[in-house]
């Protein structure tokens, strides 16, 4: 684990809002040199705190109007890896988690329509032999969406 100080925290807060913020702009705002910002960012990259930068896509603008969560109960605990490999091949599955509680695996699935969601469930997910049952929860809204504060 890499210990971070208040300057690192400030840098991370800025970069999580806009990863394209120039180092010179941050340096001016924080009262340090651009070189200091560069060194700090590189140290956080090397330690794995900063994994990379990415484009954030608005799924709705691409027509993905249905977001749902699917709880999966497996027939056997030995089937986790096999099921995950199969789920990885479905483009609609955008996140998967191993969980405690009622479900073995919890998925986030994005589709264009309810009909497409039905198809994904009926012709893909529910045909996986190692799955005992599923429960689908359709998201109405996403009122809180944020990164953790460094």
From Swiss-Prot:
Tell me the superkingdom of the source: Bacteria
Q: Which part of the chain engages DNA, per the record?
A: 23-42
In this chain the HTH asnC-type domain maps to 4-65
- PROSITE patterns from the entry? HTH_ASNC_1, HTH_ASNC_2
What the entry lists under InterPro entries is as follows: ArsR-like_HTH, AsnC-type_HTH_dom, Dimeric_a/b-barrel, HTH-Siroheme_Decarb, Tscrpt_reg_AsnC-like, Tscrpt_reg_AsnC/Lrp_C, Tscrpt_reg_HTH_AsnC-type_CS, WH-like_DNA-bd_sf
GO molecular function terms attached to this record: sequence-specific DNA binding
Does the keyword field hold rRNA-binding? Answer: no
Question: What protein name does the entry list?
Answer: Regulatory protein AsnC
| Naturally occurring in which organism (per UniProt) | Haemophilus influenzae (strain ATCC 51907 / DSM 11121 / KW20 / Rd)
Q: What does this protein do?
A: Activator of asnA transcription.
Pfam families, per this entry?
AsnC_trans_reg, HTH_AsnC-type
Q: Note the SUPFAM superfamilies from the entry.
A: Dimeric alpha+beta barrel (SSF54909), Winged helix' DNA-binding domain (SSF46785)
Q: Which UniProt keywords apply?
A: Activator, DNA-binding, Transcription, Transcription regulation
